């Protein structure tokens, strides 16, 4: 995740007066402004998961995520595995930040002006359609449920790799990549809602609607304490889960209904800005690394207890990798070329086709969202592991290709 494209910061409070939680948030927020930091932490978590899952202690890695944890409120109790609480509960906070980003950009950001947003919107759609079609062309019908896996972009990794290239590239590249990635997130949310929420129990939407009504009522009453929204948000989450849809969609809903205007005389900044600023560092340095630790532990050989390859796993891994590494940049370039050719829009000032290829390569870093979609697409452990291996391979290749191409662009610019 990333901050808004042009963030407005409220005046900081004196550190000595801040509670411990606020001081931790302030520290993490300062770290998160270094774009590479989030990607580096995510990479460390993924590497730790891979090392653990392929070590002599691999059994303890898998056992950890199956440890049952219970949450009880009065006489009501919910017991699920630690893996569930990470993927289905904590990731709701990740999707809340996604919803907040989309809400802000729709209100007064790059998505508020259709003309400015048209090219990155088309680039994002091309970067979704081409990888999906390429994947479908490479796999047999039995594996087609994973078509959406190579459509996602990991903002933290992509922006982190771009930051490693330094300041020798035009600033417009970062803005374009961020805009493309935000739209990519929106498309991914729609894909999850429309294609990976089968067997919906429509009567249970009443419970979700009750939770949402509670959130909206608190807003109308002018309640601005975040903790006051937790019970209503929990009802919304539980209701969506009971419908058969993925419960993390509750985070997107909450983000999209967060107020964008501050109460006159009562708030220094709008709630959507304050909530995003508070949650962003915790998501970047807590939720996302924990998700990587819980999901990137794929056995690569006998040391990790890997089972004999099931039919189709090799093809699945290759299809995901090819669709991300080749399909993403091809889709981005093709969509933008058609848009320019048809005179629907023009390339941003200071951005050439080489820079556009760089954004396409970095968009091929799927990681977090791609692995998340894979967990929804495949019930078979063997197929899920193969899809994860494809995502990890593709993300590494896309990062290396992006670094190499970005370095070449910088060198060409300095020698021109």
UniProtKB/Swiss-Prot annotation:
Transmembrane segments: 39-59, 82-102, 119-139, 146-166, 175-195, 198-218, 234-254, 281-301, 315-335, 353-373, 390-410
Pfam family, one: Na_H_antiport_1
Reactions that this protein is recorded to catalyse: Na(+)(in) + 2 H(+)(out) = Na(+)(out) + 2 H(+)(in)
Superkingdom in the source lineage: Bacteria
One GO cellular component term: plasma membrane
Membrane topology: Multi-pass membrane protein
GO biological process: regulation of pH
Keyword Metal-binding (UniProt): no
Gene3D superfamilies: Na+/H+ antiporter like domain
Entry's localization field: Cell inner membrane
Coiled coil regions, renumbered to chain: none
Function: Na(+)/H(+) antiporter that extrudes sodium in exchange for external protons.
Family membership: Belongs to the NhaA Na(+)/H(+) (TC 2.A.33) antiporter family.
Protein's name in the database: Na(+)/H(+) antiporter NhaA
């Amino acid at each position: 995740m990333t901050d808004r494209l042009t963030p407005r910061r409220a005046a900081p409070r004196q550190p000595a007066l801040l509670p411990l939680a606020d001081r931790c948030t302030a520290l993490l927020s300062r770290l998160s402004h270094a774009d590479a930091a989030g990607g580096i932490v995510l990479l460390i978590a993924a590497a730790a998961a891979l090392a653990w899952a392929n070590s002599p202690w691999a059994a303890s890695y898998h056992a950890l995520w199956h440890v049952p944890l219970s949450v009880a409120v009065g006489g009501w109790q919910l017991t699920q595995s630690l893996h569930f609480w990470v993927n289905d509960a904590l990731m709701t906070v990740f999707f809340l930040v996604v919803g907040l980003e989309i809400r802000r950009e729709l209100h007064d950001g790059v998505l508020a002006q259709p003309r400015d947003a048209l090219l990155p919107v088309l680039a994002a759609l091309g970067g979704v359609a081409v990888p999906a079609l390429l994947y479908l062309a490479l796999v047999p019908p039995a594996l087609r449920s994973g078509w959406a896996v190579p459509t996602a972009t990991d903002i933290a990794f992509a922006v982190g790799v771009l930051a490693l290239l330094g300041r020798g590239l035009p600033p417009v590249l970062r803005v374009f990549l961020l805009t493309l990635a935000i739209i990519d997130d929106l498309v991914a949310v729609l894909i999850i809602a429309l294609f990976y929420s089968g067997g919906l129990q429509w009567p249970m939407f009443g419970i979700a609607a009750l939770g949402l009504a509670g959130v909206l009522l608190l807003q109308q009453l002018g309640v601005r304490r975040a903790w006051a929204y937790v019970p209503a948000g929990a009802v919304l989450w539980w209701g969506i889960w009971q419908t058969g849809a993925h419960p993390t969609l509750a985070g997107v809903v909450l983000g999209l209904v967060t107020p964008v205007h501050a109460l006159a005389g009562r708030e220094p900044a709008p709630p959507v800005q304050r909530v995003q600023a508070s949650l962003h560092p915790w998501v970047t340095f807590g939720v996302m690394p924990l998700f990587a630790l819980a999901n990137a532990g794929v056995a690569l050989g006998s040391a990790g207890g890997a089972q004999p390859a099931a039919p189709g796993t090799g093809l699945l891994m290759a299809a995901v990798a090819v669709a991300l590494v080749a399909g993403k940049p091809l889709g981005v370039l093709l969509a933008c070329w058609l848009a320019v050719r048809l005179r629907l829009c023009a390339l941003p000032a200071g951005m050439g086709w080489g820079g556009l290829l760089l954004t396409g390569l970095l968009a091929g870093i799927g990681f977090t969202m791609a692995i998340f979609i894979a967990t929804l697409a495949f019930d078979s452990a063997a197929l899920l592991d193969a899809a994860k291996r494809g995502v990890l391979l593709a993300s590494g290749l896309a990062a290396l290709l992006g670094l190499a191409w970005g370095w070449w662009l910088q060198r060409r610019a300095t020698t021109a």
